[in-house]
């Protein structure tokens, strides 16, 4: 059967946390995938979307559903470094894999955030 919809763009991630190897949509094909795009300084992300992602992770088996965080920094870049993110993930006990959206050298909006036309955080994507 021919696919009638174009494939979703692959994530462009500069670094992974809580994952032994890089993740990709292609590698997760056949599973339902939930992506929680967030910024660690976003109040709604910290109070709502990340706890929701963790609850979803606990509710479904890993064989049926992949839950992935995507740290999409589009403001306050100097405060949201990978070192700061590592401390944040530890402090808030975020155990799902988290990728850092690749920075765009020509724009403050990171690459994956642009590819999916996200308008801000939090954003939840389902594949």
Which residue stretches match the model-derived regions?
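Thiol/disulfide oxidoreductase modules built on the thioredoxin-like
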Residues: 92-94, 101-127
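Residues that form or immediately flank small-molecule/cofactor binding pockets and catalytic motifs
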Residues: 15-18, 30, 72, 103-104
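Structural microenvironment flanking redox-active thiols in thiol-disulfide oxidoreductases
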Residues: 46-92, 103-110
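Proline-centered helix-kink/hinge sites
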Residues: 9, 43-44, 51, 97, ...
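Loop/turn elements at helix/coil->beta-strand transitions in domains of secreted/extracellular proteins
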Residues: 30-33, 63-66, 93-97, 121-122
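Catalytic metal- and UDP-sugar-binding loop of GT-A-like glycosyltransferases, i.e.
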Residues: 37, 70, 127
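N-terminal "domain-start" segment that seeds a small globular fold
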Residues: 1-26, 96
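Short active-site neighborhood of thiol/selenol oxidoreductases, capturing the structured segment around
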Residues: 22-49, 53, 67
């Amino acid at each position: 059967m021919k696919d009638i919809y174009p494939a979703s763009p692959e994530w462009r991630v500069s670094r992974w946390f809580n994952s032994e190897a890089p993740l990709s949509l292609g590698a997760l094909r056949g599973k339902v995938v939930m992506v929680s795009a967030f910024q660690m300084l976003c109040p709604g992300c910290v109070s709502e979307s990340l706890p929701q992602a963790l609850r979803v992770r606990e509710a479904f088996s890993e064989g049926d559903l992949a839950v992935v965080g995507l740290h999409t920094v589009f403001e306050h870049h100097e405060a949201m470094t990978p070192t700061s993110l590592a401390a944040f993930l530890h402090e808030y006990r975020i155990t799902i894999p988290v990728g850092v959206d690749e920075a765009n050298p020509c724009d403050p909006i990171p690459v994956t955030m642009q590819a999916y036309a996200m308008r801000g955080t939090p954003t939840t994507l389902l594949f």
